[in-house]
């Protein structure tokens, strides 16, 4: 999964939920043998980082992040572990950053860390 994300090449049918404006702004459409695929524009890709981390340990990150995807992971942790993981993620995100989670995940007990902005989207406070 991380290797696919790092390459920045995705099947075009995987763009559900992206507006036409965002598709045009952030992606290039494949042509010829690459038809049916899209690639993240190089000027955006150079600002992207993908890292495997152990969420139950302190995160080995020096920079802060604008966006974190942590989808369908937290459901496997008990409530105290979820809270500890959210605190770790909170520390490595910039204020106003966006956290994407899975549909089954809800962090209503972490209102002092994140505010719900959509069904699966939280904003870091």
Provide a role label for each language-model segment.
Residues 1-69, 73-81, 106-108:
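Extended basic-aromatic, gly/pro-enriched interface segments that bind polyanionic ligands
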Residues 41-43, 92, 115:
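Generic structural signal for beta-strand residues in well-ordered domains
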Residues 83-95:
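A short glycine-rich, Lys/Arg-flanked "PGG" loop and its adjoining helix->strand segment in the class I
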Residues 95-103:
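Conserved beta-strand signature within the Rossmann-like core of class I S-adenosyl-L-methionine
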């Amino acid at each position: 999964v991380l290797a696919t994300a790092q390459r920045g090449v995705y099947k075009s049918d995987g763009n559900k939920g992206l507006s036409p404006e965002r598709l045009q702004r952030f992606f290039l459409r494949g042509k010829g043998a690459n038809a049916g695929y899209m690639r993240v524009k190089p000027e955006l890709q150079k600002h992207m980082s993908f890292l495997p981390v152990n969420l139950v340990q302190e995160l080995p990150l020096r920079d802060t992040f604008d966006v974190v995807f942590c989808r369908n992971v937290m459901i496997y942790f008990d409530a105290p572990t979820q809270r500890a993981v959210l605190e770790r993620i909170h520390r490595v995100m910039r204020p106003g950053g966006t956290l994407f989670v899975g549909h089954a995940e809800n962090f209503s007990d972490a209102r002092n860390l994140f505010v719900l902005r959509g069904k699966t989207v939280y904003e870091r406070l």
